[in-house]
Amino acid sequence: MDIYKGTGAFSGIAIGKILYYHKSEYQMRQYEITDVKTELNIFRQARTRVMEQLEDLYEKNCIIQGTQAEIFLRQKNLLEGKSFQRAIESVIQSEKVNSAYAVMTTRDEMLKTFRNLEEPAIKERLDNMREISDRLIGELGGISPRIDLGDEPVIVVTESITPTELMEMDKDKLMAIVTHHGSDMSHAAIMAKTMNIPALLEIDTDSEWDGRQAIVDGYTGTLYIDPDEEVKKEYEIRRQADKEEREELLKLRREPDITKDGRKIEIYANIGNMDDLNSVLYYGAAGIGLLRSEFQYLGRENYPRENELFLAYKKIAETMGEKLTVIRTADLGADKQAEYLNIPDETNPIMGNRGIRLCLDRKRMFKAQLRAIFRASAYGNLALMYPMISSEEEMDEIEEIIREVKIGLDEKGIPYKHIKTGIMIETPAAVMISRELARRVDFLSLGTNDLSQYTLAMDRQNPLLRKKYNDHHPAVLRMIQMVIEAGHAENRRVCICGELAADTALTEEFLRMGVDCLSVVPACILPVRKALRQVDLSGDDKGA
């Protein structure tokens, strides 16, 4: 029996046979063509088919994966981009070679040009470029991109895995994931959580493990190769206990969000598209604490029309009924790009023109979304929330735009309700002026994912920093405490969302800080509810 220690990206236990997944880029034979026009048509038709495949993959996966499935839309956007298309067609025309070979050489040239850049956003873009190139080559060469896991459930071991590879695996055959590269905050790791699949990272994987028996312990980050009978028996018992615990959690679906001493601390859901609505209701969330509205802007060739936005928000409002739905205005930019937005390349897009900054630059887009939200407010209980606020001057601009939107609706006799507004506190600047910001809105919501990385000055998806990245850092927790105190000083509700809100190791600490609500992905509602119901805040003034 061999034992390997890594990092558990998602807890759980898997026992079974290993399938080692070999990643290889498609290599195509070069041959000369005589009819350039026909070859260009072959390429363009394949490009159209791949874009349709990516759209289908998004629609099939968004119900379970939510915002993680948006990677298919980002890949579709890259494929729609004229620069990539022109580069490939230029090779076909100038070198008179087959289209599959032209795609391969264009891919290789791009990867060679940017291979030494460590900027995570660029690396993700290159990964997407590699994947869509391989899809194109596969389509042109008649090769299926689907990863065959065989007939029986397996533990997939590989050097690294991308979200698209993970989503294309048969979920019924996938028991666990073990990789050498990656971080517990990567898109693939977060996706494993939503799929309830145990995942281990930073394991020195070996292709010779293929076909051997293994145990994955996501709790301790341990991998056992060829486990002995005693260890296997122990883990069979633990796996059964895991199953029973999940069944117990399901009994909490209709239980109230109250502490042992009767304090009500509501648990809301974070969702990234309309298909997540079913899981919000299934797990008994108090409402939607964060609706990421970017899904309406990605994977398309132009801005969504106001009426399209309105109909989506109206459906959400009607579905949720009296339950609150907080719509965050479009947080575009950074890793959420679309060709039609024409956002210039930035050295550091995470720190660049994104969120409210981009909305204030694109006022026509911003007003269309605001009008749609106000119109939909007549059909339910909606609230507005602004992302990436860092100054009162931004709030001045927003308030003027809101005033103009309301005047326009009034002039046309379009009904709307009073909408509560809130701010995402996700920058240190916003933390330091959180009391001033609280006076401008009805509630505050702590976006802990961005707040943590900006506070620590570390990219949370950079694998080189994984061991140093600590979102439990005292500085992060003190900032959260500061915002809660600032909000309460102005009689404003303060909610925590993001990965930290779902961390049950912090649930009691957040409650003792005085947080009013938590907002988590639907799959985490029940574990957080269980943790919350075990806390006793008796005698704690902040919990009152």
Model regions and ranges:
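Residues on a specific face of well-ordered alpha-helices
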Residues: D134, I190, L311-K314
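Acidic, glycine-rich flexible loop/linker segments
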Residues: D2-M28, G141, D148-P153, V157-Y282
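Conserved phosphate/pyrophosphate-binding and hydrolysis machinery centered on Walker-type P-loop NTPases
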Residues: Q65, L78, A100, L126, ...
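An amphipathic alpha-helix/helix-turn recognition signal
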Residues: Q45, T105, D184-H187, D275, ...
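Conserved alpha/beta-domain cores
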Residues: R246-A544
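Conserved, well-structured core domains of diverse proteins
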Residues: M1-G141
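N-terminal-biased segments
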Residues: K112-G150, I215-R239, L437-K468
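Generic secondary-structure signature for well-ordered alpha-helical cores
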Residues: T48-I63, N77-E80, F84, S90-V97, ...
